[in-house]
Amino acid sequence: RWSAEHPNLYTLVLELKNAGGQVTEVTGCEVGFRTSEIKDGRFCINGVPVLVKGTNRHEHSQLGRTVSKELMEQDIRLMKLYNINTVRNSHYPTDPYWYRLCDRYGLYMIDEANIESHGMGYGPASLAKDSTWLTAHMDRTHRMYERSKNHPAIVIWSQGNEAGNGINFERTYDWLKSVEKGRPVQYERAELNYNTDIYCRMYRSVDEIKAYVGKKDIYRPFILCEYLHAMGNSCGGMKEYWEVFENEPMAQGGCIWDWVDQNFREIDKDGKWYWTYGGDYGPEGIPSFGNFCGNGLVNAVREPHPHLLEVKKIYQNIKATLSDRKNLKVCIKNWYDFSNLNEYILRWNVKGEDGTVLAEGTKEVDCEPHATVDVTLGAVKLPNTVREAYLNLSWSRKEATPLVDTDWEVAYDQFVLAGNKNTTAYRPQKAGETAFVVDKNTGALSSLTLDGKELLAAPITLSLFRPATDNDNRDRNGARLWRKAGLNNLTQKVVSLKEEKTSATVRAEILNGKGQKVGMADFVYALDKNGALKVRTTFQPDTAIVKSMARLG
């Protein structure tokens, strides 16, 4: 059978003969055999529930919308290397060669009809509700289906994107289900209406996903058609999403927005190249969305952004936990759907904090898909000079595939091992005479001295603001709300102060520039026996003023 992990293909040969039995035409194509369905409320391939580890992909190159075969090959190679198993063709059917690549090398595909009327909104003016546009909706749906229906990579049909919902999408859904009942059909704007087999809302929070899967009698899986929004410094919340996907059967992943930055390289008058964005072309003042076109996991020439490494790590299909530190016993979970871990080799080592290899080895592991297995690597005696060590696990393929070589690390884990407490190499030194002063009006740490020398250039106060990322500036719940609440201009006012010989406890109001209280903060300052000052801060926002905050701590 065909799957993204084992894309088994066969060659179908068709011969056309005339009435006399003579062959007049011969043609052929690659075909694969697999099932795609919603079974017991879960999205399944070949009867097996799978997690969608996906991304959205626009067609983009330095030639514009014309994408070469070589660039498509580069795209699929990178996706396979970075543990992506699904691609959504956003927001239109793409070059036929892309389908052949996904069939051949193994990517699940969500093929999307070229229907988007975003500018008309989702209300009564939506074209989805106007039956005079039914023929246009049906025509684009028919063309998508009939052109590509035999590709095994297409496991889900998408009716379109951000075009409202109404009679026209109900009819396109009905038609798709009439010609092919099994393969799932999704449409984000249908939400929980009947004309979608998957609840595929975009950019829902972790709490919203938990609320959905916690309901009784749900019969559709939650698979986000878009999530994370990989613009600039991003993807920091991915771990929390996947803690839900890996523990809630009805939450089955999603497709990151998106794969590639849609901008161009230009050369300036000094011969240096730079990226262009919206506003760099056309007359001055022409409307644009600025750098909003740059929200990919890779840049426009397919160089990975740093957050693609986060995606690779979280999407990896082999994950381990350390259950016995003394004997280096690890519990390994196989998240592959159709692959035994005996297709991979485990290389492990223990390194000291200076990178010295203290022990190493290789291991073959037999573990069926979705199963777990305990593996004991054996106790390692650490030298007396080692204060801290690290157990590193690295997985690679035993045999190369066309896109993934045997030297490519497909998964890794690292665990901290406690070294010797009484190491001869490191002995605590006395910190000298340390003293601190807390301002009695603000509660701020106003002075910290060591042997009489001041260490602070200015008092240390609570900060609830930081430079905004691209997503912070775009997000309606981001930096604009932080500024509206005045979190970028704060003062402190002591409510209570308790001082002891080596500690101080402060409770303070936190005020914005308008004098409004945005919350209460508790500070605990404490010197330890070595002279180190430890500060613990707790902040409780006033939700009447503070509607959103940057992550703290």
Task: Enumerate the language-model features and the residues they cover.
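Substrate-binding/catalytic cleft of secreted carbohydrate-active enzymes
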Residues: 73-81, 86-299
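Secreted/periplasmic carbohydrate-active enzymes, especially glycoside hydrolases
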Residues: 1-95, 101, 105-109, 140, ...
